[in-house]
Amino acid sequence: MSKERFEWLDRWITHEEDVIRTTGSESNVKEIYDACAELEKDETNFILNQFSEFANHVGHHEVTGRALENIFLSYKEKNSNLRLAGFVAASGSAGTLGAGERLKENHGAKIVAVEALECPTMLYNGFGEHNIQGIGDKHIPLIHNVTNTDVIVAISDKATDSLNLVFTSEEGKSFLVEELGASPEIVDQLRHFGFSSTCNLLAAIKTAKTLDLGPDDMIVTVATDGSELYESEKTHLLENEFPKGFSSEAASLIVNEHLRGADTSNVELLDDVGRNRIFNLGYYTWVEQQGIEFSDFEIRRDQQFWKHIQKLAPVWDDLINEFNSQTGLIKTK
């Protein structure tokens, strides 16, 4: 994890020991589970697990999904032929993928799950270490509705690392505008993209090429982190790969390889066999390691389970309003 991510955490805590620094890389989630298991032995601790907390899925289905749907509908008012072809999101906890459930149900969008090529758990039943921070934890989250996922895409951290230099340097931005003719306004926004944001962008491009989409097809994705979290990573890459400085020529090579060169490799259009293959991988984490009942694991294969939990948001809202009313802190209508 980058230096800036730890510094961000430090600003929000009172005691340094409140942050437990586990060993390993971005894909070493098992070590986090082990640390949480130790904490849970103290009955005063309560573990909130974003990988298995279904409210994470439901929240994105209700909030993120509605927000993205409104964006699509606003564009559709300008182009009645516009079709929502896909929703693209990298899988960390898999919570954000819940937004795709609403977009698929209401508009037929394909749900595209993304991971790091260096740790291709879904794509190739693979493993490894990578630097796309915030995603790709070498397991299948319990809250990932795998059997409703349509496409898997893997993106290399070499692409996200190097494009970070292009998007945040004057040399890179000048190349995009002057040599490629990109809009200065759009290029200026790219400086905000962190590693997983760029990962989603590249996966959207690969999806569009794989599905042979046209001008009336829309793909939506999310920029899930900012480049300010990776200044130290940028410095490290410059020192190791570009010791004489980053140039327009270097930017050209990176863009041609990783942005313009984004192709249909490392993409799988899922059928039922592929979906069940990925779903079954979760057994080892959740049943064997984490002690989830087999029946509770298996019921997630049925889409009726997901439709049921997606209807819980209004119930939770009522409970929140009731609680607020009883405390007197917030007056409810």
PLM region descriptions:
Residues 41-94, 98-99, 159-194:
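Active-site/ligand-binding-proximal alpha/beta "capping" segment
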Residues 166, 217-232:
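ATP/nucleoside-binding phosphotransfer catalytic cores, i.e., glycine-rich phosphate-binding loops
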Residues 17, 45-46, 82-85, 150, ...:
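Conserved acidic residues
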Residues 52-55, 91-95, 115-120, 155-159, ...:
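Glycine-rich beta-alpha junction loops
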Residues 1-38:
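Gly/Ser-rich phosphate-binding catalytic loop and adjacent alpha/beta segment
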